[in-house]
A protein has these predicted regions:
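Interfacial "cap-and-anchor" motif at the non-cytosolic start of specific transmembrane alpha-helices
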Residues: 10-190
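Amphipathic alpha-helical coiled-coil "transmission" helices that mediate dimerization
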Residues: 176-230
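Juxtamembrane interface at the cytosolic side of transmembrane helices
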Residues: 1-6
Length: 230
């Protein structure tokens, strides 16, 4: 899935940006870009997460109302990003706002799961962990929690575990789609076999009737010939 790949790339860029690894090893000569890297990469994370959610959960078919909600969130988040980028780059620091789209993704995943879509269970776990990581990091940012190794890298841990469960979700979805395809193929094969059997049966019955009719005609012809001889 191309959207999942773009999402992973955005996550990697965001992780390198907040840790300073990107500035240290990749763009050390571009300090201006470093000021924007966190905000731009985080926007990429949220954007591709929202689009991936639409595709993975098939919200257009399974829940048109939730699909409209996701579209609205994409438009609003994109508008906020452009406003930050063009007018107030310092607003990129308010990363706590990402809790809103992540909460919406989590809620929609739960709703689709409860409707019986099995692959959504791993999806819900994945984004539930990511949402928890964002919340924990926000608590540290607002000094509600002290900085420890676990709290400082909580978001990194969440991203890693989230990707693991998203991989499970994708694998589960592929397996289910394959099973559906196999069942449909078996139904088609069975129907074709039934049609062939019916065709053979009709042909046999037709041949039998033609044979019977031929015997009758031959018998009548014989009778007629005998009658003429007399």
């Amino acid at each position: 899935n191309i959207y999942y790949i773009l999402y992973i790339l955005s996550v990697g860029c965001y992780a390198m940006s907040i840790d300073g690894i990107g500035f240290q090893y990749i763009w050390p000569n571009h300090p201006v870009w470093n000021d924007y890297a966190i905000g731009i990469s985080l926007y990429g994370v949220i954007l591709w997460a929202l689009i991936f959610t639409r595709r993975f959960l098939s919200t257009r078919a399974k829940s048109p109302q939730m699909d409209r909600v996701l579209k609205i969130v994409i438009v609003v988040r994109s508008a906020v990003f452009l406003f930050e980028l063009l007018f107030y780059p310092e607003f990129f620091e308010y990363r706590i706002i990402e809790i809103i789209p992540l909460s919406i993704i989590f809620y929609i995943g739960m709703k689709i799961w409860l409707r019986g879509y099995r692959p959504a269970r791993f999806f819900v776990i994945a984004y539930g962990l990511l949402l928890a990581g964002f919340l924990l990091r926000s608590f540290v940012y607002f000094n509600f929690l002290s900085i420890t190794t676990i709290s400082h890298y909580s978001l990194h841990f969440s991203f890693v575990i989230e990707m693991l469960f998203l991989t499970f979700a994708l694998g589960d979805r592929i397996r289910i789609l394959k099973n559906k395809r196999d069942r449909a193929l078996k139904r088609i094969i069975h129907q074709n076999e039934t049609n062939l059997e019916l065709k053979d049966k009709v042909n046999r019955e037709l041949e039998e009737k033609v044979g019977e009719r031929t015997v009758e005609l031959n018998s009548k012809n014989s009778e007629l010939a005998e009658s003429n001889q007399k």
